[in-house]
């Protein structure tokens, strides 16, 4: 049984076996207490080890913080506050010791900076344990949300030849000897001789491939790792992160916004119900507005404004921004957070951005100046969802590709979707780690993923 199940359901006077790692030990005259945890819950199980147990002294000597243990015994009612039961051990097995002189985790609050240096052990701490349980609940809620609505989970490729965002910040995939790659007569790298016969990269987004799937299955979603070779050493950026990207045929920008709002509300409600102890922990120890923010999202409709209205509100704010505000700029995090935190005090959706700052595939509006794009902005995070109605008109899409100096031949298959049964369609992308960061109040995105990948850091 997992310790969470034992704490919640184990009957008094029943005999059970508990497995886990020692969090604390207290030695008293004639007996000892240990608390063991297995990661299934914030709370540990208290185990009482009587001094009359065979090999008591040898066992207790090994039961230091971090030791792996199995304890079998009788469930009894606990006289202590805050715990329903405890376990009176009849047999204890120590599987692996942890030397207290060298084990880096002890019963004290460690800094997140220190914990990042021992990423292989930090999951054992209360904070990181809570993060991973909330992360798991978020992932479960995402799949459940889409499956309940008939979406197909599309497995899009991690190795790709396309750059969805057009940013060029992609990790190359090659089988060449980097010290001596094969070259053409002109001296350029000869990708025709490489593994895929052409340049290949780690994906920055599964969107374009999801559009392919949506043209056959109507409503699909992707949920997987994406990669960005962006040399940003900040608390908001990762080189490897997970994205959720639904794509819906027969859908416009309004339907896209409706789904995004419903989606976020569903996830927050699910996590509050699935992880109440963990969310209380974050509210108490990390950010005392976490629970209020979650309830705000669940109970209130998101504000919706256009980009033009957002610019007007920013200009009227009399606030001095690092990046000056004028129509045509790409909203920066400081602008997004001012709108969400200070002005509206809740998530809002900004739509209809200037075409010159958005991707080629976004549908051109009738004003010929803006595209049917939308961003969901959240307090403390800024943009948490970005999406758009896609350009379904072949002639307009071809013109946009030409205007942005993109090689149309590389997108022949994407253009084919507009030649054969084109239809209005829309979708969005959610940065999964930013969602978890927003949910938990954690200040650094590196602390909401098990193994963060950042510039000059690829440990494990």
From Swiss-Prot:
Catalytic activity: tRNA(Asn) + L-asparagine + ATP = L-asparaginyl-tRNA(Asn) + AMP + diphosphate + H(+)
Residues spanning the signal sequence: none
Listed Pfam families: tRNA-synt_2, tRNA_anti-codon
Its EC number(s): 6.1.1.22
Gene Ontology molecular function: any one: asparagine-tRNA ligase activity
Family annotation (SUPFAM superfamilies): Class II aaRS and biotin synthetases, Nucleic acid-binding proteins
Gene Ontology biological process terms from the UniProt entry: asparaginyl-tRNA aminoacylation
Cellular component, GO, one term: cytoplasm
Positions of disulphide bridges: none
Main localization of the protein described in the UniProt heading: cytoplasm
NCBIfam families: asnS, PRK03932.1
PANTHER family, A to Z: ASPARAGINE--TRNA LIGASE, MITOCHONDRIAL-RELATED (PTHR22594:SF34), ASPARTYL/LYSYL-TRNA SYNTHETASE (PTHR22594)
Assembly and interaction partners: Homodimer.
Family to which this protein belongs: Belongs to the class-II aminoacyl-tRNA synthetase family.
Record-linked HAMAP family: Asn_tRNA_synth (MF_00534)
Protein's name in the database: Asparagine--tRNA ligase
């Amino acid at each position: 049984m997992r310790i969470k199940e034992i704490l919640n359901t184990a009957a008094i006077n029943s005999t059970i076996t508990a497995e886990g790692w020692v969090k604390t030990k207290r030695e008293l005259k004639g007996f000892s207490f240990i608390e063991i945890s297995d990661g299934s819950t914030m709370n540990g199980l208290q185990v009482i080890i009587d001094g009359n147990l065979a090999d008591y002294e040898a066992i207790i000597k090994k039961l230091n913080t971090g030791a792996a243990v199995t304890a079998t015994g009788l469930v009894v009612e606990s006289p202590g506050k805050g715990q329903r039961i405890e376990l009176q051990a009849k047999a204890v097995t120590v599987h692996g010791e942890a030397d207290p002189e060298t084990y880096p985790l002890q019963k004290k609050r460690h800094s997140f900076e220190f914990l990042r240096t021992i990423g292989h052990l930090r999951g054992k701490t209360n904070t990181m344990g809570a993060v991973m349980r909330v992360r798991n609940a978020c992932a479960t809620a995402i799949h459940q949300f889409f499956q309940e609505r008939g979406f197909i989970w599309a497995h899009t490729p991690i190795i790709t030849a396309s750059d969805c965002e057009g940013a060029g910040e992609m990790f190359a995939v090659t089988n060449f000897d980097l010290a001596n790659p094969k070259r053409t007569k002109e001296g350029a790298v000869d990708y025709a001789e490489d593994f895929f016969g052409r340049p290949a990269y780690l994906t920055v987004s599964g969107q374009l491939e999801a559009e392919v799937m949506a043209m056959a299955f109507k409503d699909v979603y992707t949920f997987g790792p994406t990669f960005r070779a962006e040399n940003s050493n900040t608390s908001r950026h990762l080189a490897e992160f997970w994205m959720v990207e639904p794509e819906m045929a027969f859908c416009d920008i309004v339907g896209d916004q409706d789904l995004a709002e419903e989606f976020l509300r569903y996830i927050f409600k699910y996590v509050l119900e699935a992880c109440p102890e963990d969310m209380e922990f974050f509210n108490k120890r990390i950010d005392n507005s976490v629970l209020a923010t979650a309830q705000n999202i669940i109970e209130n409709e998101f504000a919706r404004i256009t980009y033009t209205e957002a610019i007007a509100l920013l200009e009227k704010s009399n606030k001095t921004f690092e990046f000056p505000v004028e129509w045509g700029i790409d909203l920066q995090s400081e602008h997004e957070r001012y709108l969400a935190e200070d002005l509206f005090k809740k998530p809002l959706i900004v739509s209809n951005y200037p075409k010159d700052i958005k991707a080629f595939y976004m549908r051109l509006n009738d004003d010929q100046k803006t595209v049917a794009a939308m961003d969901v902005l959240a307090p403390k995070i800024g943009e948490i969802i970005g999406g758009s109605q896609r350009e379904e008109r072949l002639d307009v899409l071809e013109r946009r590709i030409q205007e942005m100096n993109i090689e149309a031949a590389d997108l022949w298959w994407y253009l084919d979707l507009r030649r054969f049964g084109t239809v209005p369609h829309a979708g969005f992308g959610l940065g999964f780690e930013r969602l978890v960061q927003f949910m938990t109040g954690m200040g650094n995105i590196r602390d909401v993923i098990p193994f963060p990948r950042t510039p000059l850091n690829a440990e494990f």
